[in-house]
Design a protein with these regions (language model features):
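C-terminal "cap" of GNAT-fold acetyltransferases
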Residues: 2-4, 11, 89-93, 127-130, ...
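Active-site acidic-Proline motif in GNAT/NAT acetyltransferases
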Residues: 101-103, 107, 135-136
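Acetyl-CoA-dependent GNAT
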Residues: 7-15, 19-32, 37-103, 111-116, ...
Length: 177
């Protein structure tokens, strides 16, 4: 990762900037395949300032932000306590969101955020990490597979009226050096 990129744990004061960045990153990822009204509803529900503020207070959720100077270049959101049946371990955390700004991709930011998630999972005694990723997002699926994740199932993801099929992916921490 570039020397001018830094990471920080998010806190309540970050709700507004996380809301704006999450909305921007979601539109970058899904804007050309989703209806504008569906994106608007989804971003208000899951990236609205009030929603993010509540999540930043929740004990089972944590965000880590990657900054380039004073701008958010990406973030990872970790959720504890949810594991689908397809995941081969009960003691797993979920990477619920990992986004890197489209203009910042290729700089190692995603890998650094993933390394942070792996370290957090290990520190907290988990045996693995799971996530879901849109099946047509070859760039994201390729990133996760290169990191060591493997596909263990599928799930439907709804973004308003738009339906997407996601891969459920699993990473055993014993497989990561």
């Amino acid at each position: 990762m570039s020397a001018d990129i830094r990471q920080a744990a998010a806190n309540a004061a970050d709700a507004e900037v996380l809301s704006a960045a999450g909305t921007r990153f979601l539109v970058q990822a899904y804007g050309n395949v989703s209806r504008a009204d569906d994106l608007a509803v989804h971003t208000e529900q899951y990236f609205g300032r009030d929603y993010i503020a509540r999540e930043l207070q929740a004990p089972d959720v944590s965000y880590t932000i990657a900054y380039d100077a004073d701008q958010i270049a990406g973030f990872v959101k970790i959720r504890r306590g949810t594991t689908p049946d397809a995941v081969p371990a009960a003691a797993a955390i979920e990477i619920q969101q990992l986004y890197v700004d489209a203009g910042q991709q290729g700089r190692g930011i995603g890998r650094t955020l993933m390394d942070h998630a792996v370290a957090a999972a290990r520190d907290e005694g988990y045996t693995g990490i799971w996530l879901s990723v849109w099946q047509d997002a070859d760039w994201a699926t390729g990133f996760y597979e290169a990191y060591g994740f493997r596909r263990v199932g599928t799930a439907e993801f709804r973004l308003g009226r738009s339906k997407f099929m996601d891969y459920l992916m699993w990473l055993a921490l014993d497989d990561v050096s």
